[in-house]
UniProtKB/Swiss-Prot annotation:
Organism: Sulfurovum sp. (strain NBC37-1)
Alphabetic keyword roster: Cytoplasm, Methyltransferase, S-adenosyl-L-methionine, Transferase
Localisation: Cytoplasm
Higher taxonomy: Bacteria, Pseudomonadati, Campylobacterota, Epsilonproteobacteria, Campylobacterales
UniProt name for this protein: Ribosomal protein L11 methyltransferase
Family: Belongs to the methyltransferase superfamily. PrmA family.
MF-aspect GO terms: protein-lysine N-methyltransferase activity
Length: 276
């Protein structure tokens, strides 16, 4: 890859964009980018000859088609490298979350995630706070379910702590992403299904749901039913302005911990044992 590339922007009446782009493609076969009244072309080759050809065409057509030209030489950025450098590993509780182009870190439980989005890679406040809560709540041998699992990072965290882990998501793409991330970490989930918590069988020591507030309220009955007596429910994805609405749906549980990070709230509830 060369250090520089050339960018030629042609501004013209939008009705002539197709005509001029066809002409350009006859003299230069690299791709074009279009906007209203604009044609943009980029190449590692000097595009002066294209500009000169269009100026000559414009002169030949006299004033029928008017074009303005802007030819710039720009730094050629390696976008993949630039993206990789922008994604930094993070430490959250006992966990070190890192992309595959970094090395694991000694002294932490390592989770490898190649993020497509910040959400689900540990960088988003809700995921970060859930990882901290999992660090303090989940223990080896626990039965855990991750509801709305997304990338699967929270279920992976519980698995690496020695728990039995089940995961579900209503989005089939999330289910596939979860499978890929478990494979990337050489881990094996115990159950994974497309759907929600209503398909779960039995109860769990820890139920994790990092979903938006309105959905948490909608499935609150199923979430609470899935927690065994003495177990925990970790809720996140809650904007602070909706916190009280969510709390109203879970007031029959004991609130053990509240975390506010940025504008996002994470709540850890305990389902008390019933005497007798």
């Amino acid at each position: 890859m060369q250090d520089k590339y050339y960018e030629l922007t042609i501004t013209l009446d939008d009705q002539y964009v197709d005509l001029i782009s066809d002409y350009i493609m006859n003299i230069h076969d690299e791709g074009l980018e279009f906007a209203t009244g604009k044609i943009v072309m980029r190449s590692e080759s000097d595009l002066t000859f294209v500009k000169d050809a269009l100026v000559a065409l414009q002169d030949e057509l006299e004033s029928d088609i008017h074009m303005d030209f802007n030819l710039e030489e720009k730094e050629n950025i390696d976008w993949i490298k630039s993206y990789q450098e922008s994604i930094q590993p993070i430490e959250a509780g006992k966990f070190y979350i890192f992309p595959s182009w970094y090395e694991p870190k000694e002294g932490y439980i390592n989770i490898k995630i190649d993020p497509a989005l910040a959400f689900g890679s540990g960088h988003h406040a809700t995921t970060f706070s859930c990882l901290e809560a999992i660090s303090k709540t989940v223990k080896a041998g626990d039965r855990v379910v991750d509801v709305g699992c997304g990338s699967g990072i929270l279920g992976l965290a519980a698995k690496k702590l020695g728990a039995t882990v089940e995961l579900c998501d209503t989005d089939p793409l999330s289910v596939e992403s979860c499978k890929e991330n478990f494979k990337l970490n050489e881990a094996q989930y115990d159950e994974l299904w497309e759907g929600s918590i209503d398909k779960a069988v039995g109860t769990y020591d820890v139920v994790i749901a990092n979903i938006i507030a309105d959905v948490l309220r909608f499935i609150s009955r199923d979430l609470k039913a899935a927690v065994q007596e003495g177990g925990y429910l970790i809720l996140s994805g809650i904007l602070d302005k909706k916190e009280e609405l969510v709390k109203a749906s879970f007031q029959d549980l004991t609130l053990e911990k509240r975390t506010l990070k940025d504008e996002w709230v994470t709540l850890v509830y305990k389902k008390e044992k019933i005497n007798g």
